Amino acid sequence: RECVEVRGIEKMGRGAVDSNLVFIDGLVVPDADRIGAEGEGFRMLLDTLNPERILIAAEAIGIGRRALDKAVNYANERKVFGRLIGQNQSIQHPLAESWMALEAANLMVWRAAKLYDEDQPCGAEANAAKFLAADAAYEACDRAVRTHGGFGYAKEYHVERYLREIMIPRIAPVSRELIMCYIAEKVLGLPRSY
């Protein structure tokens, strides 16, 4: 344990899950305890990222759906000038678009999960699922806040929390930009850009 130091990270969200910096210095790993060949650990780690991307995508869908449900419920209850705000197309259309985007992204999540479960290559699908789900969910969360107007900024309605929580699927375990690089190179056959 003297070779390992753990430091907590304060975050804007994800209070239920610890995040830490782990420093390992001077730790000797006997050959018998090593997994795989020396220097191949990072390559082995990359193979574990597909299920993580699928999981993060499914999480994003759940957060987006919850935010959308909150927005729809609020739009069906809130009256302004004697009229439900949900009667206005400027409220309806963004929420309808979010529902469609979330459902489309969810199909890619299920496609990626099916391929993974069948032990098939799923890098493109896992990356696409994560990209599409994170974007669709972010839009749904942003629209939920805006549907609530000033109350969207208040903790009482919880939509501000969903907007904070959806940031992780947008940036982890891989950024949107790196996903686009992966798709461009591995799926479309374009030259490597980095």
Which residues are covered by each model-predicted region?
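Alpha-helical transition-metal enzyme core signature, strongest for iron centers
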Residues: 61, 65-68, 95-105, 109, ...
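Short alpha-helical transmembrane interface motifs in multi-pass membrane proteins
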Residues: 92-93, 126
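Alpha-helix capping/hinge segments and adjacent helical runs
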Residues: 120, 127-194
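FAD-binding core of flavoproteins
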Residues: 1-73, 83, 175-179, 185-194
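C-terminal helix-coil-helix/basic helical segment that borders enzyme active sites and/or dimer interfaces
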Residues: 72-86, 99-132, 145-153
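Short alpha-helical scaffolding segments that buttress acidic/His motifs in well-ordered protein cores
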Residues: 45, 71, 112, 163-167
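N-terminal alpha-helical segment
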Residues: 38-41, 108, 162
